């Protein structure tokens, strides 16, 4: 899976204006000008260095009578794919936006199966940004430091991260863990592009198997959900299967993987035993960390 990490990216989405900023704005439609930030603790979207969006990224914007209008990043800025958003009167308009763009819009189906584990399911949502003909800059940014609202992009999914370490009697010098299977989660659901909300639609748990390909870190994007059974981990190493039962989150909600939170497990393989840390909750948002032990 291609993983992209980032700390925080400020981006300007400039929509071609039909009027100069200093002109009389009552003479006709005025093109909106968008700016946007991704919440600073976000850590999976955008480029591998975690510093910027990638050309070709597409967001959907709704507001001022426009619904699900795609804007694509090209040469460092977001431009309308085929339609420009204009202010057609002097009233203040409110805008929402989401990533990644879905042509059908509305409530879309989501699968978090192993073959879907990429940025295409790392849904982001921003809301409440306003603008008008007199202030055409619509700012999807965090304004709380100035006493305003947080209108920046936030994660809508949850994230489980693993770091695999060699313990007593184990060495990764010649071979690393091949992969792992996680059981106890549901992987089918929906995302609402209008509200940024998710829902689980699967009625039963499905195991997910991830290949490590020589890496000792991995992550799984999941739908936010309550876990009602044990969360079992099997790690394949040197022809053996090491097993552990993971401790479920205690915060912010017990036994629940919460939207916007990342839960990190440190998995240590010892001779015939795995030790798994308490899940540490890290950006995206602060959270839990856990240890557990697993045996052959």
Which residue stretches match the model-derived regions?
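Sec-type signal peptide cleavage vicinity
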Residues: 2-296
């Amino acid at each position: 899976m291609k993983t992209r990490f980032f700390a925080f990216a400020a981006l300007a989405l400039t929509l071609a204006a039909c009027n100069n900023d200093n002109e009389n704005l009552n003479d006709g439609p005025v093109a909106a000008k968008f700016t946007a930030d991704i919440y600073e603790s976000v850590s999976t979207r955008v480029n591998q260095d975690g510093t910027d969006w990638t050309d070709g990224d597409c967001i959907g914007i709704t507001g001022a009578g426009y619904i699900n209008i795609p804007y694509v990043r090209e040469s460092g800025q977001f431009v309308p794919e085929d339609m420009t958003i204009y202010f057609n009167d002097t009233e203040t308009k409110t805008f929402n936006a989401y990533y990644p763009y879905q042509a059908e819009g509305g409530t879309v189906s989501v699968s978090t199966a192993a073959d879907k584990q990429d940025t295409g399911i790392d849904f982001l949502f921003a809301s409440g940004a306003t603008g008008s003909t007199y202030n055409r800059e619509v700012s999807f940014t965090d304004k709380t430091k100035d006493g305003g609202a947080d209108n920046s992009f936030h994660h809508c999914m949850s994230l489980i991260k693993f770091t695999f370490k060699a313990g007593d009697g184990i060495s990764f010098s010649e071979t690393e863990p091949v992969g792992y299977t996680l059981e106890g989660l549901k992987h089918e659901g929906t995302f609402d592009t209008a509200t940024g909300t998710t829902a689980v639609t699967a009625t039963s748990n499905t195991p997910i198997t991830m290949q490590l390909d020589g890496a000792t870190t991995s992550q799984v994007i999941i739908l936010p959900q309550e876990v009602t059974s044990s969360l079992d981990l099997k790690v394949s190493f040197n022809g053996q299967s090491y097993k552990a039962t993971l401790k479920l989150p205690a915060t912010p909600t017990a036994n629940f993987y919460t939207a916007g939170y990342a839960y990190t497990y440190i998995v240590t393989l010892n001779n015939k035993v795995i030790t798994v840390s308490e899940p540490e909750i890290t950006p995206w948002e602060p959270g839990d960390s856990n240890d557990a032990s697993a045996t052959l």
